[in-house]
Amino acid sequence: MSIAPSNISIGLPAVLLGASTAIFFILERARPGRELPQSRGWYARALLITLVQLAITLVTARLWIRIFGDASVFKLSHWNSPLLEGFGGWFVGTFFFYWWHRLRHARGWWLAFHQIHHSPSRIEVLTSFYKHPVEILCDAILSAVILYPLLGCSVLGAFWYNFFAGTGEYFYHANVRTPGWLRYLIQTPELHSVHHEFDVHRNNYGDIPLWDRMFGTYQDATDFVPRCGFPSGAESRLIPMLAFKDVYAEDPRPAAVKSAATHAALCGALLRGS
């Protein structure tokens, strides 16, 4: 029994995405960018959320084209190159996801959409899609709106979009050191560590630094910040976070201590960028 060529074509970006995942895992262990703290139960939590991410992706992969149909503002599918469709969709998507990311840091939205992702003290490939299922679903919906009714991508173009977007997230969350010049082109692990910095959690929102530079949220960095994530104990409270409880606000440290820590972290960020 032969396999349809379309299935082979669709499988290629998925296989390459899996290969990029494996490559970053290997690089993290062969040449880690810095020593990561130990976090009890981290791998179990990360595996659980990753399985949820995979399930949502598989269930919705072909659903969006049925919902949105063929009507679209643009017709990237007319390029007759799914690879270019995917790259074009990813580039356009970085603009929309920059603003969506900033919105997720606003009070209220943070609870539903983003505190789980910022809770780990370990920033590595596993952290890439460590997100609340609601956030994962909303990301998928936004991607679908960009790809189909806006850009008019084909299904195969959407699979290539997932390859570029997924590999990008794996890259800038990976615990690897990168050449300094890369930070002018794409979000690097060093830049993104600033975004996850303990008691800061801001700036460097975009998959590419262009949007952060344009809209005043770029914070330069050529090295990793000393600490990321939530206070000790808070990051392990996955169930309360899934129930939209603000575990960061429940930090038992006195307000003065939290304020001083935030001030120190921000001063450190300014010094690194000077």
Model-based region annotation:
Residues 2-7, 37, 41, 62-87, ...:
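Membrane interface segments of multi-pass transport proteins and intramembrane proteases
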